[in-house]
Structure formats: C-alpha cells, structure tokens
C-alpha cells in the first residue's frame, strides 16, 4: 500500500453542509459527485415560494459574526439580505404584550458582560445552572432564558450546555443577524452554483441506499447505480441518517434533537404596524416579521414554539401581538414538530467542544449541524462541511501500488 492524494469524492446530502463540502472538494481538484435523495437541494434550508411570500422551513437568521458568514465571505458569496433589528419589539408575559421584559437593569449589565467577554468553562454547565449562578432576579433569569431560546432554538435549558448559549448570545447581540431576501433558497442556490462552477456534479433524486469501504476507498450503492470514490462525506440529515448508512462507524449523537412548531402567516398588512418582533417570556414562543420592509406584497409573520406547542397556542400569541390578523390573512402554514437542531450538546457530555469530530478516518467524513466544535445551527453545518473538505484535501489515502 502506498500513500497518494485522493482523486475523487462522493458527498451524500444536498443541504448547506454537503454543498459547501462538494464545492470545496471540487475546487481542490477532486472529481466530486453530490447525491441528494429528494427532488431539490437544500434540506432544511429549502424555501417554498407561495402567493408572493418566501416560506423558509422555520424562522432562519444568518449571524453576521458566525462561521457561516465567514465561510461565505471566503467563498466570495454576498447574499442580498436585510437587517431585522428593530426597536419595535414587545415581550409577552401573562398573556399581555409589554414594552419592557422585566429585570431589565440587571439583565442589561449581564448581557454587556456576555457580549464583551468570551466565557470559558461553560461546557460542563447547563443553561439553567449558568443563569442561576449569573442572575439574582427571577425576572432577569426568565428574560435571559427567552433570549437563549430565540438564539439557540432550544427550550430545555437543563439539557443544553451553557457554552452554546453564551456563544449565540454574544454574536446575536453584536454584530447581530440578517434575514435573506428570497428566503434561504438564495443561500442554497448560491452554494449550488458555486459547487457546479468548481466542477462538482450535483444529483438530486439520487438516494444512497448503502455505503461500504473497499480497497479503492468507498462504494456507494444507489437504486440503479454503484459509485466509487476515495473520499466519502456524509452530510445527510442528522445522527439517525448517518447511522442508517454507516452503522457502527457513525458518530454517537451528543444529545437528543430539538424540535419546534412553526406558524407562518401571510397578511395584507400588520394590524399593529409598530410590532415587528415579540418574545414570550413565560412561554417558549416567538414572533417576527420575515418579509423585508420594502416587500410590496403584504407582510410575512413567522411564529414559533420551541416546545412544539399546538397551533392554537401560536394563534393565541398572534392574537396578543397582532389582534385583528385573522381579517387580513391570506396565507397560513403550520409545521408541527420540525427538527431545528439535529442533536443538543449536553453539559454531561462536555458541551460544544465535545461534539463528534468531522474526520472519521480512512477517507470518511461526517458533516452537519451536530458535528465539530465550531458554531451552531447553519454556522455548524457550513463550518463542518468546510472542515470535512479541508481535512480530505490535506490527508493522503491508501491505494494499491
């Protein structure tokens, strides 16, 4: 056996992680094929365009200070986006909208400290423990918990490690987030176009049925075809999807998945024009305008519950924040129990830094929002996809002489 540079790669999964990996591998000179089981690329980043509205698979935001934005800049991708930050916010407590969330003075000082100082040693603490140790006021803790929910998409703060929350709050506060014009499909389309320009072959409707290691590297079996490559990147879904293909070789999930329920409302206009954003303080709910201010075909509101509440609870929040919305609605879509995060890093497992490694050895890599030490949500997906490609390009593989 001799060491040689890899010449070919197969990427399974056409979401952001897989598209980034495929593009980077093709740029590095590898003959790269991406396989996506569904008819369209994007995974949970795909967007549905209906009645003039761009409907993402749940509320999505791009963190300006996050790993995804850094990688997009490095790839020369500049997506049309807008800043949703608004002073037109309300906080819902006791079923009533309020201008101030409660515990504001103590909370402001704490948030300033979180934004300015990188918090160390939080991987072994739960969010609940961290907030109890950091804030004296119960109201301040409740508001901090609401901010953690909206930045992490996780309602179970006993299960989530505090390092995730601290990192998300820090980049969420400054430099903040942006929403993408055209929905997150614009991100998917840009990554796909770049991968194809680099030479990658993107194959929708091509589901991998089995993978096996072979003397030449890896063999992937499809319904009517067998492909072989020296490098294999699994970027399809979450831990269960990886395990279905890899069996015992699959990384162990660092924790359970996090789910949310989403209600999208396309309105002719807002009954309360000054209310663009609302956060539930004593319930794990959220409301935000997800159409740009200059959108001329109505207003899109996205409501979410991080505890997969029934539709009626989200409608009740809309009644509280935007009374009269039912007379102006022309589109409704309810998505129950969607996967928001494939696996939650727990404090008992060491938190974010202890997530499974992307490089699994022998030309095998796994990418997604639950792998690698860097980032959360799409930041983790894109970061792990880039890390998989970088590791493959610098790692020689064994091949027969």
Show where each model-derived region lies.
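Mid-domain catalytic core of redox enzymes
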Residues: 4, 209-310, 355-356
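Helical element adjacent to the flavin cofactor pocket in flavoenzyme catalytic cores
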Residues: 167-218, 222
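N-terminal Rossmann-like FAD-binding beta1-loop-alpha1 element of flavoenzymes
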Residues: 7-34
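Rossmann-like flavin
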Residues: 96-97, 106-179
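Glycine-rich FAD pyrophosphate-binding loop
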Residues: 26-50
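A conserved beta-strand/loop capping segment in the N-terminal third of enzymes
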Residues: 46-54, 62-112
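Conserved Rossmann-like nucleotide-cofactor binding loop
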Residues: 17, 40, 239
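Conserved flavin/dinucleotide-binding core of flavoenzymes
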Residues: 2, 290-401
